[in-house]
């Protein structure tokens, strides 16, 4: 089981998913080399995605519906110091436009509507773990992620959790694989001790 990125339900989001709309900057940033992208969101994920994209893209617009970001101060400082990132606050993307690929977004900012040319939109409004089947067995945090230590040990005896469903800072394939290896070793050790 793994978390799924939250969608924004933007007009055009589903139509252009995989053709200019992405939910993973780590996966897709290189496809936008020397292009213009829009990142939607205001938390750590959005600002981290904007920073990553800034290393590839000519321009990155960071669009957030509030007047200030929720991300950590150090991350915000890095974003604001990056020349090719432009933060657009009190703004929302109301529509993603294009033919076969994304060509622009319709932006609503401070009551005014305008078109913003871009080649890609990165939706970075968080993720939702699929842990409901385990909700009565193990402790989860407020967002539904299973609370587990580095060995994968959870609050329930003999249940180990790894990958993107457990509490941790980075959710990528490489960290999930590492978690899996740790869980296997921990489960083996657990079973050996039970014999």
Predicted regions and their residues:
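Short, small-residue-biased leader/transition segments that mark boundaries at the very start
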Residues: 1-7
């Amino acid at each position: 089981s793994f978390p799924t990125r939250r969608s924004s339900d933007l007009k055009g989001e589903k139509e252009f998913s995989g053709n200019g709309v992405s939910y993973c900057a780590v996966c897709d940033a290189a496809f936008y080399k020397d292009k213009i992208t829009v990142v939607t969101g205001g938390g750590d994920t959005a600002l981290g995605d904007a920073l990553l994209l800034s290393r590839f893209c000519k321009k990155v617009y960071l669009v957030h519906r509030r007047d200030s970001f929720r991300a950590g101060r150090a991350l915000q400082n890095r974003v604001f110091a990056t020349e090719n990132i432009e933060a657009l606050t009190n703004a929302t993307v109301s529509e993603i436009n294009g033919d076969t690929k994304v060509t622009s977004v319709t932006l609503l900012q401070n009551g005014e509507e305008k078109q913003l040319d871009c080649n890609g939109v990165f939706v970075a409004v968080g993720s939702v773990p699929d842990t409901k089947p385990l909700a009565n067995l193990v402790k989860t945090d407020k967002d539904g992620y299973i609370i587990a230590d580095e060995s994968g040990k959870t609050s329930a005896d003999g249940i180990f959790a790894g990958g993107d469903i457990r509490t941790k800072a980075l959710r990528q394939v490489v960290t999930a694989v590492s978690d899996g290896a740790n869980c296997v070793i921990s489960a083996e050790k657990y079973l050996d001790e039970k014999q």
